[in-house]
Amino acid sequence: MEAQGVAEGAGPGAASGVPHPAALAPAAAPTLAPASVAAAASQFTLLVMQPCAGQDEAAAPGGSVGAGKPVRYLCEGAGDGEEEAGEDEADLLDTSDPPGGGESAASLEDLEDEETHSGGEGSSGGARRRGSGGGSMSKTCTYEGCSETTSQVAKQRKPWMCKKHRNKMYKDKYKKKKSDQALNCGGTASTGSAGNVKLEESADNILSIVKQRTGSFGDRPARPTLLEQVLNQKRLSLLRSPEVVQFLQKQQQLLNQQVLEQRQQQFPGTSM
């Protein structure tokens, strides 16, 4: 393509009267023909290697103003051709869709339309729900004697109870459950060991009495109080008094005589 542009660019230069080295070759001497051919070849090679170079750079190897004009035309033509080729390629890229590409683009657009439509329906449905929720009837507490009302109920069909009475109901159920468990446990224990309960109670009473008198098992006896100590001292002093001693001796003698009389009655032949 660039070589053809060079050939076409050389045409106008020849028409304008500027002599070309290739045109002068037949009129010149045979010795000058190789030099002119070499100069033309060098000019062509430079134009091919540097198609978009400036006017001065392209005219420097040729050394003439007439040779610079086709170079300018060649650069401009090459630039325009490249731009047109780039536009054609862009058009080809834009128009050359893969098979089914149009369908995919259309399907994407349809999906977007469906999403927007569904979003609109969802928003309208949410608005309807909010409207229905806002217009819901208020409910009253089902506990007897309570007049508390509310409009914030999750399930309209179920009965509603205020927090205070709901907690009270839960507590009552818990207490009832515990009492039932205690009664069941007590009933089974009483039916299984009715006789053992009495024995345990009597044993507990005896143990409590013994502990009160002597303290706990394994320990020393409980220390008597001050009143008990005073009473014990008075008893000892009375027992040691002479009157009490004489009285006790007389009583002992009487007992001994009674015992002897009983023995004589049982065994009349015996004598002490």
From Swiss-Prot:
Keyword list, A-Z: Disease variant, DNA-binding, Isopeptide bond, Nucleus, Phosphoprotein, SCID, Ubl conjugation
GO CC terms of this entry: nuclear speck; nucleus; RNA polymerase II transcription regulator complex
One GO MF term attached to the UniProt entry: DNA binding
Segments of this protein annotated with the region Disordered: 1-20, 74-142, 175-195
Ranges for region C-terminal domain: 214-270
Main location: nucleus
Disease as annotated in the protein's UniProt record: MHC class II deficiency 4: An autosomal recessive disorder characterized by immunodeficiency, failure to thrive, and recurrent bacterial, viral, fungal and parasitic infections from birth, usually affecting the respiratory and gastrointestinal tract. Patients may die in infancy or early childhood.
Domain notes per entry: The C-terminal domain is necessary for the RFX complex formation.
SUBUNIT field: The RFX heterotetrameric complex consists of 2 molecules of RFX5 and one each of RFXAP and RFX-B/RFXANK; with each subunit representing a separate complementation group. RFX forms cooperative DNA binding complexes with X2BP and CBF/NF-Y. RFX associates with CIITA to form an active transcriptional complex.
Annotated function: Part of the RFX complex that binds to the X-box of MHC II promoters.
Protein name in the entry: Regulatory factor X-associated protein
Species this protein is from: Homo sapiens
Gene name of this polypeptide: RFXAP
